C-alpha cells in the first residue's frame, strides 16, 4: 500500500504540487537498520527501555525523525504495555499502538490531546512534535509521573534541543529531572554497492573536511557515486541516517539546572566522548556507505 501526502499552492503560472510517497512496506521498524553506530544504538536502546523519562529526536523536516520514533516504538512494543501516540498526521499504522491524529478544527491539538492521553493510563506516549510551551510542559510532567515520553523537535543538533525547551519556558530543574537523552539526525543517500568507486583525497581537502589519516592509512580514501543499471544510473540506492546522541548524565543535568547555553552543553558532550553528526557522517564516508559530498551537504 502507498499513501500520498499532497500539498498544492497556486502560483503565477499554475499550481505547484508536491507529492510525498509513504510506502508502508518500506518503513524501517528495526533500529539497527537506520544507521546508528553500534555504541549509540546500545545507548539509545537502553534509554527507550526505561519505564519513565523524556527521549527526544531532533533534526530538520525530512530527516527521518518519525521513522526513528516508529522503530523505537516497535522495539519496545509489548502486549503488556499501553502505547498511545498523537501525530500530525499519522504516517504509518503500528500494530498494537493507539494512534491519534491531531485535528485543530475540533480543538484536538497536541497539547489538548496529550492532556487527555495522560488520563488514559498509558505506559508509553509518543508526541509527534513539541511545538509550544504548553505541549512541552505536559510532556515533561508526564515523563516525571511514570510515563516514557518520546517526541521530536526541530533543532540543528542535540544540544540545541535542550536550549529550545528552556527557551520555551520549561523549568530547568524539571527538564533535568525528566530528560533521558537526545538524538540528532540527518539523512544521506546510500552509495550503490554495485558501482561505487574509491579515490584518494588530497591532503588539503582531507584537512578541510575533517577526515584524518586512520590506522596509518595514507592518503585518505573516500568513495564516489558512479551509476549503473542497479541504481538507475544515480549512483545511490536508498538513504541512511547519520546520528549524534547526547545522554543526560549528572554533569549534563547540572548544566541544564544552571541554564547553560547550547555551546556549553556541546563542549561537555565532547569531553564525554559524544560523536557529533559530522563525525558519524565522515566515518560513513570513509567506509563507503555514502559520499563525502553528501555528508558535507547535510552538516554544513
What are these regions (language model features)?
Residues 1-300:
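Short, flexible helix-loop junctions that flank or precede catalytic/ligand sites
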